[in-house]
Structure formats: C-alpha cells, structure tokens
C-alpha cells in the first residue's frame, strides 16, 4: 500500500514538519504528500493560511522529491508516474482552476526532468506550476517584440534537473 496524504499546504508542511522530516524523509518512506491550496490560494483567510515557504522548507530535507504540476494533464501524468516511484514526494497544487498548458496527455513526462515548452535563443524563462502558463504568455508577447524566449517547465523542483 502506498499512502497519499492531502491537506492544505500551509498546515501539511509546517505543522507536521518534524514528522515529515524524521518519519517520512529520513527513513525514505514511500509516502506522497499533496499540499493543496498552496501559495496565497486562501487569500482572505490571512497569512496563517498562506504557504509561501513550503518548497524552501521541504527542499532542505534530504530524500524529499518536490513536484509542482502545471495543469490537469501534467497532474495526471505525474500521478501515473508516482504509482511506480518509490520514496517521499511532496506535490504542490493551488486551489483555483488553472489554464491548460498541454492540450492533451500525448507528451512525455519524467520525474526530475524539465520540459522545454517554447524554444528561443535570446533568454530563458524557468517556471513551475500555474506560472508556466504565464511564462508561455510572456514568451508570446516577447516574440511580438522580436525577442525569442525559451520557456522551461521545471515541474520537479527537487531533484533539480541540471541539464
């Protein structure tokens, strides 16, 4: 059995950090943690409900894989890959619906491997999660000004794809 735990990211990562560190990450337990409503998704509920440091805190813990999918298609691919992936994983998702980055699920997905979403030689924009759509829109606007921007979807924050 492979446990999946879902909870608001602000509580999942900060209130249970000692248990995540010792009982999940250090022992390389095959647990998948899903932080929902990450970032400032809970807006008006105030700073106690914002999860701005979840990625930074979990990035400092050994053996933890951190994934932030860009859209529903990538989330589906990621979940399918996690079925065969052993080890602790933190998945960060927002609260609100996100714009599609992919138009279907006909693409390759590999945990730990970034994906070039738009090619360009003038500059590179690296994004993850719902910001990938924003980066793609920015690349289109830059193209209108004669600037060719590469957009890289860094869906896996840790381990970081150094290629």
Where are these regions (language model features)?
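Short helix-loop-beta junction
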Residues: 134-152
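Short beta->alpha junction loops
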Residues: 152-158
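A short, acidic, amphipathic alpha-helical segment used as a generic capping/interface helix at domain edges
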Residues: 159-163
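Conserved thiamine diphosphate
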Residues: 2-124, 133, 149
């Amino acid at each position: 059995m492979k446990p999946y735990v879902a909870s608001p990211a602000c509580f999942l990562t900060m209130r249970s950090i000692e248990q995540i560190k010792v009982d999940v990450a250090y022992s390389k337990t095959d647990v998948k943690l899903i932080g929902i409503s990450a970032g400032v998704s809970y807006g008006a509920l105030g700073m106690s409900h914002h999860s701005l440091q979840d990625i930074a805190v979990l990035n400092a813990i050994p053996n933890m894989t951190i994934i932030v999918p860009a859209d529903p298609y990538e989330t589906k691919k990621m979940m399918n890959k996690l079925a065969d992936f052993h080890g602790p994983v933190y998945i960060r998702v927002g609260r609100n619906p996100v714009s599609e980055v992919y138009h279907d699920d006909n693409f390759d997905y590999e945990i730990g491997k970034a994906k070039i979403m738009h090619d360009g030689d003038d500059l590179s924009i690296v994004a993850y999660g719902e910001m990938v759509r924003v980066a793609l829109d920015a690349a289109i606007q830059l193209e209108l000004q004669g600037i060719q921007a590469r957009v890289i979807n860094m869906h896996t924050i840790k381990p970081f794809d150094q290629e």
